[in-house]
Curated annotation (Swiss-Prot):
Transmembrane regions: none
Record's subunit section: Heterodimer of LeuC and LeuD.
Gene name in the database record: leuC
InterPro entries membership: 3-IsopropMal_deHydase_lsu, Acnase/IPM_dHydase_lsu_aba_1/3, Acoase/IPM_deHydtase_lsu_aba, Aconitase_4Fe-4S_BS, Aconitase_4Fe-4S_dom, IPM_dehydratase_rel_enz, IPMI_cat
Enzyme Commission number, as recorded: 4.2.1.33
Single GO molecular function: 3-isopropylmalate dehydratase activity
Catalysis performed (reactions): (2R,3S)-3-isopropylmalate = (2S)-2-isopropylmalate
Pathway where it operates: Amino-acid biosynthesis; L-leucine biosynthesis; L-leucine from 3-methyl-2-oxobutanoate: step 2/4
NCBIfam families, alphabetized: leuC, PRK05478.1, PRK12466.1
GO BP terms, alphabetized: L-leucine biosynthetic process
HAMAP family: LeuC_type1 (MF_01026)
Name by which UniProt lists this protein: 3-isopropylmalate dehydratase large subunit
UniProt similarity note: Belongs to the aconitase/IPM isomerase family. LeuC type 1 subfamily.
């Protein structure tokens, strides 16, 4: 019987497979940031160990950094300590660090792919749940805990049981104006936020292969939001074209050999998945979350659902709680509620294509007077490219704030956050209670939908935008 893409990558990395024991995988890339690494480096220090493979370990600062200044003190005492500790640890252990003053600094899941650190067929880990982003390249990428960060630093390996496999196929082509963010939110709306628990998901179908690498990263980024361990997309010419010429990409004969291997990284026709989910791309409309998990999502032209519409008692209770927290009334349209803040950024939607999509909407218009709107590029490289294209001028003339790279308002770990009961149109990946600030209300949308909400002052259907 044939093998899935996941099975091929997993089996190629099994270093030790003792009978009755969880297999040990070799890890090709270890990405590190300031929040989940301090205790891991402390563990190495206490045990007298070194980093096993410094050439395969890359660190950056992203979660805590200020997006208004390069001052390491700007986000508070804990943030300063974490960033200073990362500097010290990387210097002591010889790990490459792209700190806040480096031209390659950025959100870890933006920085890795744009430098060619992320390559097809690799195993990639990071102490961050959205490591699944890198699966867009056909790599097996997943988040790990701090104790596992220490283990990978020390051994370049990790115990990892084989997961179940799920195929999510998005058949056909999407309509005009429908983005990768809409696709993945529609997927999660169908599977629910727990539908992928215990699985590694492979996304496929015409609507997926039509996506750019930026779009594919958006989809895989949110695999974790349907409960999956990881999400993968088979590499193809789009992948190879994106990687070629990047800083850490192979060159010359090594490039040719790599591409030949990468072409084998696809699911065999006779491979069997443990579960299969299909969607019709033509049915997908612009998506907006209404609740407090990404699975609580509707098309922008649909009414807010009533708890009574859910047959499952757990879902019904969850809907009741979510509506109360979000300050929404069932049956109404989301367009009836004003937004207070807009955030375009995060490891989901802060790449150059996301900046361009928001700029198309913003050009020649003005942000509504009651809205604060932030545009936060995902890395210094994205920022530089956007500025070279004049996108920053478009945003600033429209009344958006053009910020420095960082995780920003995705999570309340820096100065960018929501106040109590503030409503935000956000391009990030999580709308949990308090995720963007205590009692803040988060609605997940695409960059174009977010920019349009900033200008209109409320949610609008981007398909009607003139």
């Amino acid at each position: 019987m044939g093998k899935t893409l996941y099975e091929k990558v997993y089996e190629a990395h099994v270093a030790v497979a003792a009978e009755g024991e969880t297999p040990i995988l070799y890890i090709d890339r270890h990405l590190v940031h300031e929040v989940t690494s301090p205790q891991a480096f402390d563990g190495l220090r206490e045990k007298g160990r070194q980093v096993r493979q410094v050439s395969k370990t890359f660190a950056t600062m992203d979660h805590n950094v200020s997006t208004t200044t390069k001052d390491i003190n700007a986000s508070g005492e804990m943030a300063r300590i974490q960033m200073e500790t990362l500097i010290k640890n990387c210097q002591e252990f010889g790990v490459t660090l792209y700190d806040i003053n480096h031209k390659y600094q950025g959100i870890v899941h933006v920085m890795g792919p744009e430098l060619g650190i992320t390559l097809p067929g690799m195993t990639i880990v990071c102490g961050d749940s959205h490591t699944a982003t890198h699966g867009a390249f056909g790599s097996l990428a997943f988040g790990i805990g701090t104790s596992e960060v220490e283990h990978v630093l020390a051994t370049q390996t990790l115990k990892q049981a084989r997961a179940k496999t799920m195929k999510i196929e998005v058949q056909g082509k999407v309509a005009d104006g429908i983005t990768a963010k809409d696709i993945v939110l529609a997927i999660i709306g169908k599977t629910t936020a727990a539908g992928g628990t215990g699985y590694v998901v492979e996304f496929c179908g015409e609507a997926i292969t039509d996506l750019s690498m930026e779009g594919r990263m958006t989809v895989c980024n949110m695999a974790i939001e349907l409960g999956a361990k990881a999400g993968l997309i088979a590499p193809d010419q789009t992948t190879f074209d994106y990687i070629k010429g990047r800083k850490f990409a192979p060159t010359g004969a090594d490039w040719d050999a790599a591409v030949e291997y990468w072409k084998t990284l696809k699911t065999d026709e006779d491979a069997k998945f443990d579960a299969v989910v299909t969607l019709n791309a033509a049915d997908i409309k612009p998506q907006v979350t209404w609740g407090t998990n990404p699975g609580q999502v509707i098309a922008v032209d649909e009414p807010i659902p009533a708890p009574e519409s859910f047959s499952d008692p757990v879902e019904k209770a969850s809907a009741e709680k979510a509506l109360a927290y979000m300050g929404l009334e069932a049956g109404k349209s989301l367009s009836e509620y004003k937004v207070d803040k807009v955030f375009v950024g995060s490891c989901t939607n802060s790449r150059i294509e996301d900046m361009r999509a928001a700029a198309v909407v913003a050009k020649g218009r003005k942000v509504a007077s009651h809205v604060q709107a932030l545009i936060v590029p995902g890395s210094e490289q994205v920022k530089a490219q956007a500025e070279a294209e004049g996108l920053d001028v478009i945003f600033k003339e429209a009344g958006f704030e053009w910020r420095l790279p960082g995780c920003s308002m995705c999570l309340a770990m820096n100065n960018d956050r929501l106040g109590p009961h503030e409503r935000c149109a956000s391009t990030s990946n999580r709308n949990f209670e308090g995720r963007q600030g205590r009692d803040g209300r988060t609605h997940l949308v695409s960059p174009a939908m977010a920019a349009a909400a900033a200008i209109a002052g409320h949610f609008v259907d981007i398909r009607d935008w003139k």
